[in-house]
Amino acid sequence: MNDKKIDINVYSENFPNSEKVYVEGSKPNIRVPSRMIKQTATKLNDTIQENEPIYVYDTTGPYTDPKYDIDVTLGLKKTREEWIKDRADTEESKRSYLDTLKPNFDNAQYGISSRSRKAKSNKNVTQMHYAKQGIITSEMEYAAIRENIFHNRADHDNKITPEFVRDEIASGRAIIPSNINHPEIEPMIIGKNFLTNRTPSTAIFLISSL
């Protein structure tokens, strides 16, 4: 591939009558995507009634954001990178995940790092550990905002709070798959009290990612 840039509009055309929008959290680097779907007006008894747009869970990633500048050499946007570093409980490993795949890979050529991260000595970096310590992480806040996407009207009392998410994780009733070496992940929560209550790969996440 000679051209490293991708025309974002090609992807956006797959979602007519809709727009990718964001809900900002308590910090500027917490921006949760959702898709606003426009509804046509309803004709009833010779009157036209406008219908409010519908907001749905959006998991399509940055490639459906018309404002996102895609460069395939840089990979996906690292949504969680700042959150992970701000917690100051991980460090860069000497091991690179590209050492065996591409021994001669030149990181500097692309301005990226292929070094893995690991927990610092005597540190636990799982979302369950944070939850049990009473810590509400950015991932938990992000997941809570996502859960309320369907209820974003001003007259609706949001029932899913970051604290509720934390408590569900601490109790073992829910998980947020969030490996520290996948900062590109847009956090979602899986549990019986949430929009996604089961997934075939949950067992794999529990074993290899948490």
Spans of model-derived segments:
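A cross-family glycoside hydrolase active-site/sugar-binding cleft signature
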Residues: 199-201
